[in-house]
Amino acid sequence: MSGADLERRRLLAALAAGSAGACLGGGLSAPAVLAQDAGTGPSLGAPLADDLAARPARWYRKLEGLRVECGLCPRRCRVADLERGACGVRENRAGEYFTLVHSRPCSLHLDPIEKKPFYHVLPGTSSLSLATVGCNLECRFCQNWEIAQARPEQVPGFDLPPDRVAALAGKYGAPTIACTYTEPVVWAEYAIDVAVAGRAAGLRTLLVSNGYIEREPLDDLIAVLGAVKVDLKAFTDGFYRDQCRGERK
């Protein structure tokens, strides 16, 4: 039996047993094998704000008085200095906007691709699936609310840059990487960089999203993605307003 087959059997055994190397937010657990391979593993203490994975954000414009306007989603948050947007993962620092979750996923799994769900994209294969904290909606029925509505300080995360994500997918024979579980729109910079690294390694990157995004970042994402699944929550504006605190656009 090859080393790759042994690694795969170890991983499947860990998944079947419900083994968890670290509990990362709301019961979403990384299997022991993946947790070990992720490198440094989860940082178990709640980090200080200065320790977060701050990277320059894209898709914003500067306003007067050190304020910025985010152009990532239709909320168009206007954010004062040292404040954050509604998603909680993007922060204004002296008139410069930053994402606080780049290369810091809080959930990491090897899932059947049908779980995303994608039924006509490489059926029968596995997808390395990851998420950071954060979302730009507040759905009352969200099954992953513990991480979707959390702030970066509240949930431990892995130090996992895009090239390591691609390497892990390759190691476990996953032909795809899925940005899922929370809302990849609010960590779009990381998702794009993961997709670029994945493409260089011959992998496709998938996005599972609520679709609440502006045109420019949408175009930037689509340019590097292999497939997108949009979760339409309902068909009425009232439902989006009352149950998701957002808009159907």
Give short role names for the model-derived ranges.
Residues 1-19:
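N-terminal secretory signal peptides and thylakoid transit peptides that target proteins
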Residues 159-249:
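Conserved AdoMet/S-adenosylmethionine-binding subsite of the radical SAM
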Residues 31-32, 208:
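Short, surface-exposed beta-strand/loop patches at domain edges
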Residues 42-69, 74-131, 146:
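N-terminal [4Fe-4S]-dependent radical SAM core
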Residues 99-180, 185, 191:
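Extended interfacial segments that mediate partner engagement and assembly in macromolecular machines
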